[in-house]
Protein backbone atom coordinates (compact mmCIF):
# COMPACT_ATOMS: atom_id res chain seq x y z
CA UNK A 1 0.00 0.00 0.00
CA UNK A 2 1.26 3.49 -0.87
CA UNK A 3 0.48 6.10 1.77
CA UNK A 4 1.00 9.86 1.64
CA UNK A 5 0.87 12.11 4.71
CA UNK A 6 0.60 15.80 3.79
CA UNK A 7 0.67 18.40 6.54
CA UNK A 8 1.23 22.03 7.34
CA UNK A 9 2.79 23.23 10.57
CA UNK A 10 3.50 26.68 11.96
CA UNK A 11 5.22 25.94 15.27
CA UNK A 12 6.21 22.30 14.76
CA UNK A 13 3.30 20.69 16.63
CA UNK A 14 1.40 19.46 13.58
CA UNK A 15 4.68 18.24 12.07
CA UNK A 16 5.35 16.14 15.17
CA UNK A 17 1.87 14.63 14.92
CA UNK A 18 2.32 13.95 11.17
CA UNK A 19 5.57 12.08 11.84
CA UNK A 20 3.97 10.05 14.64
CA UNK A 21 1.11 9.15 12.28
CA UNK A 22 3.57 8.14 9.56
CA UNK A 23 5.33 5.91 12.07
CA UNK A 24 2.07 4.20 13.01
CA UNK A 25 1.10 3.71 9.36
CA UNK A 26 4.41 2.02 8.57
CA UNK A 27 2.89 -1.38 9.32
CA UNK A 28 0.54 -0.94 6.33
CA UNK A 29 3.04 -0.14 3.60
CA UNK A 30 5.28 2.52 2.09
CA UNK A 31 4.72 5.90 3.77
CA UNK A 32 5.85 9.32 2.51
CA UNK A 33 5.53 12.42 4.67
CA UNK A 34 5.47 15.76 2.83
CA UNK A 35 5.15 19.28 4.20
CA UNK A 36 2.61 21.24 2.17
CA UNK A 37 5.24 23.78 1.07
CA UNK A 38 7.03 20.93 -0.74
CA UNK A 39 3.92 19.08 -1.99
CA UNK A 40 3.15 18.77 -5.67
CA UNK A 41 -0.09 17.68 -7.29
CA UNK A 42 1.79 14.70 -8.76
CA UNK A 43 2.47 13.39 -5.24
CA UNK A 44 -1.01 11.88 -5.15
CA UNK A 45 -0.41 9.70 -8.21
CA UNK A 46 -0.66 6.01 -7.36
CA UNK A 47 -1.43 6.41 -3.66
CA UNK A 48 -3.95 4.22 -1.82
CA UNK A 49 -4.27 6.26 1.37
CA UNK A 50 -3.99 10.01 1.91
CA UNK A 51 -3.68 11.57 5.35
CA UNK A 52 -3.94 15.38 5.51
CA UNK A 53 -3.33 17.50 8.60
CA UNK A 54 -3.20 21.15 9.55
CA UNK A 55 -3.24 23.40 12.56
CA UNK A 56 -6.66 24.96 13.09
CA UNK A 57 -6.50 28.63 12.13
CA UNK A 58 -9.62 30.75 12.07
CA UNK A 59 -11.76 27.59 12.30
CA UNK A 60 -10.14 26.17 9.16
CA UNK A 61 -7.02 24.58 7.73
CA UNK A 62 -4.11 26.77 6.68
CA UNK A 63 -4.45 28.59 3.37
CA UNK A 64 -1.75 26.34 1.87
CA UNK A 65 -3.72 23.17 2.67
CA UNK A 66 -6.96 24.72 1.41
CA UNK A 67 -5.32 25.79 -1.86
CA UNK A 68 -3.69 22.38 -2.42
CA UNK A 69 -7.04 20.62 -2.09
CA UNK A 70 -8.82 23.24 -4.20
CA UNK A 71 -6.25 22.78 -6.99
CA UNK A 72 -6.60 19.00 -7.14
CA UNK A 73 -8.38 18.00 -10.35
CA UNK A 74 -11.98 16.81 -9.98
CA UNK A 75 -12.17 13.08 -9.19
CA UNK A 76 -8.36 12.92 -8.84
CA UNK A 77 -8.82 11.08 -5.53
CA UNK A 78 -11.34 8.53 -6.81
CA UNK A 79 -10.41 5.16 -5.30
CA UNK A 80 -8.18 6.78 -2.66
CA UNK A 81 -9.01 6.35 1.02
CA UNK A 82 -8.32 9.26 3.35
CA UNK A 83 -8.22 10.45 6.94
CA UNK A 84 -7.70 13.95 8.32
CA UNK A 85 -6.31 15.45 11.49
CA UNK A 86 -5.67 18.83 13.02
CA UNK A 87 -3.99 20.39 16.01
CA UNK A 88 -6.23 22.51 18.19
CA UNK A 89 -6.58 24.38 21.43
CA UNK A 90 -9.29 24.03 24.03
CA UNK A 91 -11.25 27.24 23.64
CA UNK A 92 -15.00 27.85 23.70
CA UNK A 93 -14.90 30.34 20.83
CA UNK A 94 -12.82 28.05 18.61
CA UNK A 95 -15.11 25.12 19.44
CA UNK A 96 -18.12 27.21 18.43
CA UNK A 97 -16.73 27.86 14.92
CA UNK A 98 -15.15 24.46 14.40
CA UNK A 99 -11.82 22.86 13.64
CA UNK A 100 -9.75 22.20 10.53
CA UNK A 101 -9.98 18.42 10.10
CA UNK A 102 -13.72 18.14 9.26
CA UNK A 103 -13.32 20.89 6.67
CA UNK A 104 -10.29 19.17 5.13
CA UNK A 105 -12.37 15.98 4.97
CA UNK A 106 -15.15 17.75 3.09
CA UNK A 107 -12.66 19.04 0.54
CA UNK A 108 -11.12 15.61 -0.03
CA UNK A 109 -14.53 13.99 -0.46
CA UNK A 110 -15.31 16.65 -3.04
CA UNK A 111 -12.34 15.36 -5.04
CA UNK A 112 -13.59 11.75 -4.91
CA UNK A 113 -11.78 10.30 -1.87
CA UNK A 114 -13.44 7.89 0.59
CA UNK A 115 -13.16 8.42 4.34
CA UNK A 116 -11.62 5.68 6.49
CA UNK A 117 -12.27 7.13 9.97
CA UNK A 118 -13.75 10.30 11.40
CA UNK A 119 -11.53 13.41 11.45
CA UNK A 120 -9.50 13.72 14.63
CA UNK A 121 -7.94 16.56 16.59
CA UNK A 122 -4.79 16.58 18.71
CA UNK A 123 -4.48 19.07 21.55
CA UNK A 124 -1.90 21.78 22.06
CA UNK A 125 -1.51 23.72 25.30
CA UNK A 126 -1.47 27.13 23.67
CA UNK A 127 -1.31 28.89 20.32
CA UNK A 128 2.34 27.93 19.85
CA UNK A 129 2.11 24.65 21.74
CA UNK A 130 3.56 22.48 23.01
CA UNK A 131 1.47 19.38 22.44
CA UNK A 132 -0.40 18.13 25.47
CA UNK A 133 1.10 15.07 27.14
CA UNK A 134 0.24 11.79 25.42
CA UNK A 135 -0.78 13.29 22.07
CA UNK A 136 2.14 11.81 20.09
CA UNK A 137 1.32 8.36 21.45
CA UNK A 138 -2.36 8.89 20.66
CA UNK A 139 -1.45 9.91 17.09
CA UNK A 140 0.65 6.78 16.58
CA UNK A 141 -2.14 4.57 17.95
CA UNK A 142 -4.74 6.32 15.76
CA UNK A 143 -2.60 5.60 12.70
CA UNK A 144 -2.02 1.97 13.72
CA UNK A 145 -5.80 1.53 13.99
CA UNK A 146 -6.22 2.89 10.45
CA UNK A 147 -3.46 0.60 9.16
CA UNK A 148 -5.00 -2.45 10.82
CA UNK A 149 -8.46 -1.62 9.47
CA UNK A 150 -7.08 -1.45 5.92
CA UNK A 151 -5.34 -4.82 6.03
Predicted regions and their residues:
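Aromatic-flanked redox-active Cys/Sec active sites in thiol-based oxidoreductases
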Residues: 7-11
Amino acid sequence: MKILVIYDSQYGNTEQIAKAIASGLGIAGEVRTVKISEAKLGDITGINLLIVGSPTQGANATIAIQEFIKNLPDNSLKGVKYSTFDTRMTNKIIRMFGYASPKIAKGLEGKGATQTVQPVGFWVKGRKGPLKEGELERATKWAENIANALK
